[in-house]
Amino acid sequence: MTVERMPSSLGGATSHGHLLELIRSADGLSRQQLLSTTGMSRATLYERLDTLTRRGYIYEAEPLTSTGGRPSRKIRFEDRGRVVLALTLGQTHGTVSITDTTGRQLRSKTFELEISAPADSVLAPLVDTGRKLLEQGTGETLLGIGVSLPAPVEAGSGHVKHQTTIPGWSPDSVVQAVKATWDLPLVIENDARAAALGERNSDAETVVYVKVGTGIGCGIVVEGSILRGAHGSAGDIGHIRMSADGPLCRCGRHGCLAAYSSGRALRDRLGHLGLAKPEDISAAAATGHPEVLQALADAADVLGRALAATVTTLNPDRLVLGGQIGALPGFVEKVSSRVLTDVVERIAEGMVVEAGHAEDLAACHGITTLVMRKIFAPEAVDQLFAEEADSAAG
C-alpha cells in the first residue's frame, strides 16, 4: 500500500529546502523567530537566507509590530506575481484557471466538453484558453501547470491508465499537449484525488472525497498526502460490485456501484424524462420532481452502503460529497443517513459528512497544491541546489 508522502529533504531539517518550507508555510517569520524555531547558528541561518533571497525564493517584507527598538522584518516566500495554470476536466465540462500560489482563482473560464472525444479536440482548446488567460495578466510569472482528469493517472509520469473514460487517448496525450506549449513543471492527477486534497482543512485530517457526476470517483487524503495504493488504484469505488445480477456497467460487469449511483445510471433510469446530463437531473430535483427525487434517494442509499465499508476501513475525519449529483442537499443527507446506520458508533463518532465546495474550485486548489509541492518541496529545492553545486565543482 502506497501513500504519497509529503516530500522530505535530502539535506536535513535545516537545509535550504526545509528552511524555505518553514517560511512558505507561515505568514512571514522574523530572523529571530527562525533562529528560535530551527536552532541554527546565526551565521548558518543568515547565509541560507541570503542564498534563498538571491535566488528569488524569499524576500523581506514590512516590519513586524515592535514594542520598542528597531522593528524586525518578515521573511516571506516570494509569491508576488507568481501563478499556476490549472486545467480541471470533468466528463462534460472543463475549467481553465490562473491561480495564485495558494490555489485561489485569479481568472478562469468554464466550458462544455465531451471527454470521450479525441484528445486533440479536447486538449487544444484548453491549452489555447490557458495561453489567452495568461496573456491577460501583467508581469506574472508562470511557475507550472496542473491538470486533473476523470481517469486513473500514473503517479510521476502523468500517464493515463485504464482508459475506460477516455478510450481514444494515448497514455501521454496530456503530457504531449501541455509540453508542446510550456516547458515547465507539470502535474497530472485524477480529478477526485485533486479535489480531496483541495477539500482538506489541515494536513492532520483524513478526508474521503467522493465525486458523483457523470461517473463516480473517490480520493483519499491521509495527513496531507494522497493515498494511492499498491498499483495506484486506491479509491476506485465505482466498480465495487453491489449485486451479481444488477444493471450492466460500462466495464462489462453487472452490479457495479457506478451502474446504480452515477449520473450516467440516473440518466439511463430517467431518460424518458429528457434528462440527459447531471445538471438536468439536479435542476429537476430542485423543482421537487417526485420520480427524480426517488431515483436520487435510491442511488444515495446504494452509495451509502458502499461508503459504509470505506468509512469503517479508513475512519476519516470528514466524508465529503462533490460533483453535480453528489453535492445535492437531499443526496448528501441520504448518503449520510445510510452510512451512519451501517457503521458502528465508535467509527462514526466525530465524523462530518458534508457537501464539498464547487468541484472545480476543490480540484483547482488541490492541483495547484501538487504543482507547488513539486517545485518547492524541500527535497526538490535541495536536489536543485546539490546539482548546481556539482555542476560548479565541475
For each predicted feature, which ranges?
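Short, acidic, Ser/Thr-enriched surface-loop or helix-capping motifs
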Residues: 100, 155, 221
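Glycine-rich phosphate-binding loop and adjoining helix at the ATP-binding site
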Residues: 105-206, 330-341
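Short glycine-rich anion-binding loops that position phosphate/pyrophosphate groups of nucleotides
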Residues: 64, 150-153, 213-215, 325-326
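Short glycine-aspartate micro-motif
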Residues: 84-88, 142-146, 207-211, 217-219
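Short, acidic Gly/Pro/Ser/Thr-rich loop/turn segments
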Residues: 92-94, 152-154, 217
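ATP-binding/phosphotransfer module of carbohydrate and carboxylate kinases, centering on a glycine-rich
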Residues: 1-127, 131-136, 140-141, 257-394
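Glycine/GP-enriched mid-protein hinge/lid loop-to-helix segment characteristic of carbohydrate kinases
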Residues: 108-110, 117-122, 169-290, 394
